[in-house]
Regions:
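Acidic/histidine-enriched segments that form metal/cofactor-coordinating
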Residues: 44-158, 179
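His/Glu-rich zincin catalytic helix
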Residues: 1-48, 156-202
Length: 202
């Protein structure tokens, strides 16, 4: 079996940061990191990369936490095809007014499900009591109200800030020749230029 996970250090706590291109402080609504994760699978040609990976027989998924977002799959066959798809969709976001508005309804339903989950509500309320101002208390998905303010420009700004190899970690586990798999990954990287550290404000 082979396993790969590609994670970016961008989670629900990263809702205030400095735009490296303008030097201005950027404040984003709660739930943007999770929203961005949902939208990454949709490609410009209408294809959903998650379905492409599943059609190859791969067990693929993605998730968002307080401090990172990750895209992953595991398989016994078709690893190279899966690697192509993973590195393609993570490096080629496609956001439009239409597909962002559509996603708000989908995530809104997901938020509603968690609102009805007593265990999750217990956790969120405990975090709210433990942390007065720290963004770790924020629900990863945000709220219906906060995600209503998300737009394509905001998603692209966050993508361009946080989805860069210098802020990401790619881990591969399995029967690989280290030099060979590293070469294959480097061939697929679009932008590998070094960047300065991201200035986050908490």
């Amino acid at each position: 079996k082979k396993y790969i996970i590609w994670a970016t250090k961008f989670g629900s706590i990263d809702n205030t940061f400095i735009d490296s291109t303008t030097g201005e402080k950027v404040v984003i609504p709660d739930g943007v990191a999770h929203f961005l994760e949902h939208k990454m699978f949709e490609q410009k040609n209408g294809v959903d990369s998650l379905y492409v990976l599943m059609a190859l027989g791969l067990d693929a998924n993605a998730y968002t936490t307080n401090d990172h977002t990750a895209y992953l799959f595991e398989c016994t066959d078709h690893f190279d095809e899966g690697l192509d798809e993973l590195m393609d969709y993570v490096q080629n976001p496609y956001f439009t007014d239409q597909n962002v508005e559509k996603e708000k309804g989908i995530i809104g339903q997901e938020i509603g499900m968690y609102d009805d989950d007593p265990g999750w509500q217990l956790y969120i309320n405990a975090m709210d009591c433990l942390y007065e101002k720290n963004p770790i208390k924020v629900d990863t998905a945000g709220t219906v109200e906060t995600i209503s303010g998300i737009n394509p420009e905001m998603l692209y700004k966050c993508y361009n800030t946080f989805y860069h190899p210098s802020n990401m970690v790619l881990t591969v586990v399995g029967d690989f020749e280290p030099e060979a798999i590293l070469a294959e990954i480097k061939k697929r990287l679009k932008d590998n230029e070094a960047r300065g550290e991201i200035t986050r404000i908490y």
